[in-house]
Amino acid sequence: MFIAFVAAAAAVASHQPPGAICVSIGQSNAADLQYICESERAWSRAVASGDIDAPTRILANDYVGIGSSGKRFTKAEMAAQPARTSKSVSYSDNDYVRVRFFGSTAMNQGRDSLRTKDGHTSHLIWTDTWLKRDGKWQIVQSQDAELESSNLAADNLQ
């Protein structure tokens, strides 16, 4: 989800809605939706706060992430990233998250805004695949891409 943190922060677009929107497309269990939405937000905010607990909790042990550069990441690598990114990122949060449930699988698509400490803003679009195993929701796969500022208006929740 947030694999290209610092590289993506070079974009110059500056847009942040007043609050993140997290919605279920189709039917969902309210408690599952709330947990996934809160977890996505915690992971995004960890980029700036340095909190390693959020990715450690929500990423499955067999997690594989693909960054916008094509690099693969494991759970251990992703859990360690907030400690590094928080040195250069001052703000990171979800703009929106769309969640689609398919039984014990949830597919999420979202957008995050990031701001570096030197004032550059960037946006990442991402997809996360969640599985509910042994009663616990965790991300097993994610992929992100930097959103060009010229495409920002076209990427909206409506």
Residue positions per predicted region:
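Hydrophobic h-region of N-terminal signal peptides that target proteins for export
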Residues: 3-15
